[in-house]
Amino acid sequence: MANSFINKKADLTTTDLTTLYTVPSFKTAVVKSLIVSEDAGSGSTITITLVNSSGAIFNLFKDKAIASKATTELLTNPLVMEESEVLKVQAADANELHVIASILEIQPREVVS
C-alpha cells in the first residue's frame, strides 16, 4: 500500500482533552503542519500533547497563546510519530479554536523473499 497524505480536524467545542489523531498499526506518521485558528474574537490558549504507546505524556505546547481572530502554524519542523502514538489537543476556552493537522502516513515496504 502506498504512503498517503491525510488531514485531521477538530472544532474544540469543549475544554476537554480531545484526541486529534492516532497513528494506525504498522505505520509511521509525519505531521507536516499543525494549524490553530481562533474565531471568537477574544483570544485563547491551547495545549497539545503527544502520548506514546506506553502512555507517557509529552507536552508539545503548553498553554500556547492564539491571538484573537488569528491563524497560527505551530510547527516549524515536521513531527514524526510512531505506531499507536496519539496527538491530543485541549482548548482553554470552549467554542473558540479549530485545529487542522496535515499528516503523511508512511506504510513500510513489504519484503518479499
Task: Show the residue positions of the predicted features.
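C-terminal interaction-tip segments
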Residues: M1-A29, S33, Q90-S113
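Tight coil/turn sites that cap or link beta-strands
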Residues: F26, K69, E83-S84
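Short solvent-exposed strand-capping/beta-turn motif centered on an Asx-Ser/Thr pair
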Residues: V36-G41, A92
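Short proline/glycine- and polar residue-rich coil/turn motifs
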Residues: K64-T71
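Noncatalytic modules at the cell exterior or secretory-pathway interfaces
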Residues: P78-E96
